[in-house]
């Protein structure tokens, strides 16, 4: 990402699966922006899907994605990755740049966006359960997009991406990370 419209792959989310990461089978198209809700249905938003993520949770799928000007959290009806999909109330999820999901050991889900904003999600995925907080590293800016959190060896690791100069499209596009003992 970061290369503008020429780098966006289209208006669909497609899935492949593999048991050993060598041989892949095409599952199919699981989302098409023609399904996009009225609040996000501008002509430009229907053209592109940006940074989709899929997560499995208690017998259903969760998906976050970014059309051009909005972001969305969707949940499946059940175990079929092809859906049907339902959008969470858009007020809480609208306008979150490059959203990502993280599930903590206690089952709590968090929405991360803009690389350093995080908020707990309500248990029914109907919105945010808390006001967002910023999780910055102590000594520098970590970036502006491409965020994700993993728990590794008991530490929370926030990954992010940004241009090395902290100026868009100048320098190299780098991966950054920082660690913490708690998620917020």
Regions found by a protein language model. Name each.
Residues 1-184:
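Carbohydrate-active catalytic/glycan-binding domains of CAZyme proteins
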């Amino acid at each position: 990402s970061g290369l503008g419209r020429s780098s966006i792959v289209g208006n669909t989310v497609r899935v492949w699966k593999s048991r050993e990461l060598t041989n892949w089978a095409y599952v199919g198209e699981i989302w098409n922006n023609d399904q996009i809700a009225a609040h996000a249905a501008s002509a430009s938003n229907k053209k592109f899907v940006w940074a989709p993520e899929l997560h499995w949770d208690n017998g259903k799928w969760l998906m976050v994605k970014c059309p051009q000007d909005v972001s969305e959290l969707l949940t499946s009806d059940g175990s079929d990755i092809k859906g049907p999909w339902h959008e969470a109330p858009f007020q809480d999820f609208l306008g979150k740049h490059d959203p990502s999901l993280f599930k903590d050991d206690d089952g709590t889900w968090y929405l991360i966006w803009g690389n350093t904003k995080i908020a707990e999600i309500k248990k029914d995925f109907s919105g945010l359960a808390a006001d967002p907080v910023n999780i910055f590293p102590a000594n520098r800016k970590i970036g502006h997009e491409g965020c994700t959190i993993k728990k590794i060896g008991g530490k929370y690791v926030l990954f992010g991406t940004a241009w090395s100069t902290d100026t868009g499209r100048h320098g190299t596009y780098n991966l950054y990370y920082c660690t913490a003992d708690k998620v917020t």
